[in-house]
């Protein structure tokens, strides 16, 4: 309940709409409750007395009630729509803002697919539930109990049928509601999993076809789709009980009402018009209870969705950034790793263990090792994408945990393994690195990144990039992301295997161009190519999360067996004969 109160705080902005929408629906309900009484008067005093003037007068009143009811309904719908859409917009914005603030570890734990579902499907479900609740949550009970009260004014004994029927119906409805809430949560979770599989297949369709795995993927999708279908069918069967049970109870009540009413009319206690009025009141109750049952089903779905949204909103951010700027040591090395160990959430074993090294300002640091040895993990700790479990990472002599987020981010230019570009012009993508970058600055960065020719071939900086850079090759995307990072002019440039799609000649030109900048930029190059890191001032050799070698290329060729194996596997022609033997 506390979680739901947290989300409902956004309704404070729409207090007026949240009050006026139910109020106008109550006014509409009042019009509906008046109609059976007017009809009874038409039958009793108009038709019964053959008074056409009275009939026409009552017809005018019925018409007025209809017009007023329609006006009240339209106004209520307008206020309800304004409140629900506004609330959903604010909730979606808060959810998006919260996701933007989550750490990499928290994002990994929640998962991309479930976040997308909660941002879209769940928020829409909450919006629908709120809209219906504002319109019907008070209106339907008001008509049900109002009709019962009006029935007592007509005939007390006949009204007792209403007294018995309504509580029984309430028990049926709320029992089904109580059982169905957990099922809707399972439906949304199954939808998360299905969307995850769908997203994975769409992104990896070329790989799937290359390995002829279409049938296996279809089978997996069908299994997850069947699971979702089973949950939906379970919910559907349960929900399907609602209307039949309510109809049975209502029909029994109507038959009883007509039966009792007939005896009381014969006894002269009530008139035929009163029985008609009682029947119309019961019909009103039927309609509203059906609406109420549908509303409860929708509210159940909305509450399940709201709970899933709250699970993201209440995530307590573990990574806290200071506000005060730090005092750096101008004489300190650019980066220091001091006995650093780190493991990913729920991974068990450490990704890296007891890593220690010093990177001086202006140096190029190469990081090499086999797949999964922890290369990317090391460089992701420098901009504090994750917090270390033990040890310390320092930038310019200051622990990265002591830096304000903006200050640390400004110092580090990160080029990830997967080149990410956004839909828009090349200029717009480049200006992610520097918002006010001039065309001259952009072209300079493109020249260094060996991407200038690519841009010229695309008709310049105003050429459009499709979503995820679909209209560019892998190497072109990598060069553009490198140029974007260079525009930032960072103190520390991290290239996390970001030139893997480049040919050897272009890769060499790129490294030489960065080296020839002549500034004090410290460069980290993560690669599986020995040729890429060979000229680095220091090379870190990782094996299964451990630092097994550190030094220059020549030093490592002398004393690091892992580095020798990597190098000779790529340059077998340089392997000495005695080693080959």
Report each predicted region and the residues it spans.
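An intracellular "coupling" helix at the cytosolic face of ABC transporter transmembrane type-1 domains
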Residues: 10-16, 101-105, 121-130, 134, ...
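Juxtamembrane helix-loop junctions of ABC transporter transmembrane domains
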Residues: 23-24, 31-44, 65-112, 116, ...
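ABC-type nucleotide-binding domain
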Residues: 329-581
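Transmembrane helix-loop-helix hairpins at lipid-water interfaces of multipass membrane proteins
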Residues: 12, 18-75, 79, 152-157, ...
């Amino acid at each position: 309940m506390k979680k739901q109160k947290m989300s409902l705080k956004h309704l404070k902005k729409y207090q007026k709409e949240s009050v006026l929408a139910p109020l106008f629906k109550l006014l509409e309900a009042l019009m509906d409750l008046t109609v059976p009484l007017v009809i009874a008067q038409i039958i009793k005093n108009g038709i019964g007395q053959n008074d056409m003037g009275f009939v026409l007068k009552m017809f005018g009143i019925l018409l007025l009630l209809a017009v007023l009811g329609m006006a009240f309904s339209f106004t209520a719908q307008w206020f309800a729509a304004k409140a629900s859409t506004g609330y959903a917009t604010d909730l979606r914005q808060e959810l998006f803002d919260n996701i933007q603030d989550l750490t990499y570890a928290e994002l990994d734990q929640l998962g991309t697919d479930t976040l997308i579902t909660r941002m879209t499907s769940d928020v829409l479900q909450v919006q629908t539930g709120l809209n219906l609740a504002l319109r019907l949550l008070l209106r339907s009970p008001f008509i049900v109990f109002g009709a019962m009260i009006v029935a007592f004014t007509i005939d007390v004994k006949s009204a007792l049928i209403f007294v018995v029927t309504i509580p029984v119906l309430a028990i049926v409805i709320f029992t089904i509601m109580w059982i169905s809430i957990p099922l809707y949560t399972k439906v949304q979770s199954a939808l998360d999993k299905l969307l995850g599989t769908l997203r994975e297949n769409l992104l990896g369709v070329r790989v799937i076809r290359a390995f002829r795995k279409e049938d296996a993927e279809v089978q997996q999708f069908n299994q997850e789709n069947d699971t979702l279908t089973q949950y939906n069918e379970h919910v559907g069967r349960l929900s399907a009980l609602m209307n039949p049970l309510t109809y049975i109870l209502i029909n029994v009540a109507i038959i009883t009402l007509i039966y009792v009413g007939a005896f009381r009319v014969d006894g002269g206690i009530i008139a035929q018009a009163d029985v008609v009025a009682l029947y119309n009141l019961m019909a009103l109750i039927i309609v509203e209870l059906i609406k109420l049952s549908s509303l409860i089903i929708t509210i159940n779905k909305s509450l399940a969705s709201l709970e899933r949204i709250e699970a993201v909103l209440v995530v307590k951010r573990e990574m806290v950034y200071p506000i005060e700027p730090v005092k750096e040591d101008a004489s300190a090395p650019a980066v220091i790793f001091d006995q650093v160990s780190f493991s990913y959430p729920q991974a068990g074993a450490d990704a890296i263990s007891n890593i220690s090294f010093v990177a001086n300002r202006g140096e190029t640091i190469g990081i090499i090792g086999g797949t999964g040895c922890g290369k990317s993990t090391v460089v992701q700790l420098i901009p504090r994408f994750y917090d270390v479990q033990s040890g310390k990472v320092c930038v310019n002599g200051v622990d990265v945990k002591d830096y304000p987020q903006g200050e640390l981010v400004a110092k580090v230019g990160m080029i990830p393994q997967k080149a990410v570009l956004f839909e828009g012009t090349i200029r717009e993508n480049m200006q992610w690195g520097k918002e006010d970058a001039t065309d001259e600055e952009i072209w300079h960065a493109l020249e260094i990144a060996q991407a200038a020719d690519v841009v010229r071939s695309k008709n310049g900086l105003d050429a459009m990039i499709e979503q995820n850079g679909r209209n560019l090759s892998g190497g072109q995307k990598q060069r553009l992301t490198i140029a974007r990072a260079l525009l930032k002019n960072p103190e520390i440039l991290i290239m996390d295997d970001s030139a893997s799609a480049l040919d050897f000649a272009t890769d060499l030109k790129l490294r030489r161009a960065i080296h020839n900048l002549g500034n004090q930029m410290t460069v980290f190059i993560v690669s599986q190519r020995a040729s890429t890191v060979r000229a680095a001032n220091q090379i870190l050799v990782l094996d299964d999360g451990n630092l097994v070698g550190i030094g220059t290329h020549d030093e490592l060729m002398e004393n690091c067996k892992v580095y020798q194996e990597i190098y000779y596997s790529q340059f077998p022609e340089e392997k000495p004969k005695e080693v080959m033997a």
